[in-house]
Structures are given as C-alpha cells and as structure tokens.
C-alpha cells in the first residue's frame, strides 16, 4: 500500500457547493433559500421546537416525573496517594487543609478514594470515604472522620 493508492481518490470526493456565485451555477440568485421570509435572511430560522406560533409539543404534553437536580451532591474526589503527597509528615488532615492546598474546590464536598498506601497513623476529615480508603487509614492506626455533605444549591 502506498499513499497514491489510498481511498478516496481526489476525483471521488464531492466538492462543496459554492452558493450565490452566478445564475449559471444553478445556485446563484437566492442561493437555494427560496424567496424572502425568515429563513431567507442572514441568521434566519426558527428556534428548535418552534411550531409557527402553535402551542409546541413540549408544552402541550404534561409534566412527568420528579426532578432531583437541586438535591444532587457532587463530590470532589481525592486519592490517598495525592493526599499523602500533599501533606507529607502531617498526622492530622482537616477539610480546611484540603481546601487551602487546592486539592478540592472551596466549599465542595470531598470524597477520599483508596489509590495509594498509608504507612503511618493519620486522622483524616472529609465528607465521604470509599470503604477501602477507610480500611487502609484505620489499618495503619489512623482515624476517619465523616462530615455531613450539603447539596451545592
């Protein structure tokens, strides 16, 4: 196989339509947009769901179900290896320390995940811990302190 054998061949590729370039081209004058009206104008067209003033389908149908978005809690996740690297030599890690180091967004709930090894006893404070992360911290003689997470609404 060589470069000149690759498909598609240049003559097989369809050329782009250049509209509004004279009546001989077949797409001159109105450039395929028809005569006048909103869709013929630059930037013209209707919004998705607009049905010409008729009550649109999404408003004719009833509301359905329950929207839980305002109560959703999204955690900033931090792995143990990153936590230990940032706080090397410290035996107590509070939430304020985590925010101050920039490991999580200020005020965001924090979850600690288990990647990495804990070698010394640590006291860690966060909103949530994965089961294995908590086991690793407790296994090294440390302490886990879970705080209550508040929805970010």
UniProtKB/Swiss-Prot annotation:
The lineage of its organism: Bacteria, Pseudomonadati, Thermodesulfobacteriota, Desulfovibrionia, Desulfovibrionales. HAMAP family: Ribosomal_uL15. One of its GO terms (molecular function) is rRNA binding. This is Large ribosomal subunit protein uL15. It holds the Pfam family Ribosomal_L27A. Keywords: Ribonucleoprotein, Ribosomal protein, RNA-binding, rRNA-binding. GO terms for biological process: translation. Residues 1-49 are annotated as: Disordered.
